[in-house]
């Protein structure tokens, strides 16, 4: 939590008033430098927070996803090749997270990571680690987070590098598993609405991006 506050403080410092005096600017620059140093040290000390993501506490896992998102946005230089090899399977394969209370922060991390580091997809077994878990996630109705997860599906599709997946088979599997998740017995009106809206947006997105998935 302290590290997360440090990261957020660093973001605030970036947005300080441009009319600040030179003394204030020097002070703020020093604070920012110290903030980045602390963030880098914490990232290394806690081994990319991989162990924390395995916590039995959903609150801790959710906070860790948020923390990683802050790092990706504001301290991206800590994600070197070795770090990417360790983190890519964990972040892109995070769909085995079954606690719906974690899904909002989980999605933020996945989307920001995939957009910021498209090369990350080359550091993991896409079909075994990412897609198999993603298909299970969809089949199980997003483990109870339909209203959170369905609106993010188009963003996820858009973030996947075209070369990372097999076109025709990927689209078929995606729609098949998405529909399977829709056929659950208990589906609220809000869940049904979220599904219908998401399905429409997905269909339109696929039409607009058909060249990414050659048939």
Regions found by a protein language model. Give the residues of each.
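HEAT/HEAT-like alpha-solenoid repeats
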Residues: 17-50, 78-95, 121-138, 166-181, ...
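Long amphipathic alpha-helical scaffold regions
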Residues: 35-36, 49-52, 57-59, 88-92, ...
């Amino acid at each position: 939590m302290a590290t997360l506050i440090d990261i957020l403080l660093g973001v605030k410092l970036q947005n300080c008033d441009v009319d600040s005096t030179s003394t204030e600017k020097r002070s703020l620059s020093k604070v920012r430098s110290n903030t980045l140093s602390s963030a880098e040290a914490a990232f290394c000390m806690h081994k990319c927070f991989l162990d924390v993501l395995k916590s039995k506490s959903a609150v801790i896992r959710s906070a860790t996803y948020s923390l990683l998102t802050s790092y990706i946005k504001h301290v991206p230089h800590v994600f070197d090749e070795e770090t990417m090899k360790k983190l890519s399977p964990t972040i892109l394969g995070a769909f085995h997270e079954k606690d719906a209370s974690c899904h909002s922060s989980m999605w933020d991390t996945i989307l920001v990571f995939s957009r910021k580091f498209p090369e990350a997809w080359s550091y993991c077994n896409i079909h075994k680690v990412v897609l198999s878990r993603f298909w299970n996630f969809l089949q199980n109705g997003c483990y109870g987070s339909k209203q959170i997860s369905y609106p993010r599906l188009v963003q996820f599709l858009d973030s996947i590098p075209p070369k990372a997946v097999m076109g025709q088979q990927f689209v078929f599997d995606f729609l098949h598993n998405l529909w399977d998740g829709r056929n659950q017995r208990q589906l609220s009106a809000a869940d049904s609405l979220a599904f219908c809206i998401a399905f429409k947006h997905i269909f339109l997105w696929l039409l607009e991006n058909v060249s990414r998935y050659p048939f």
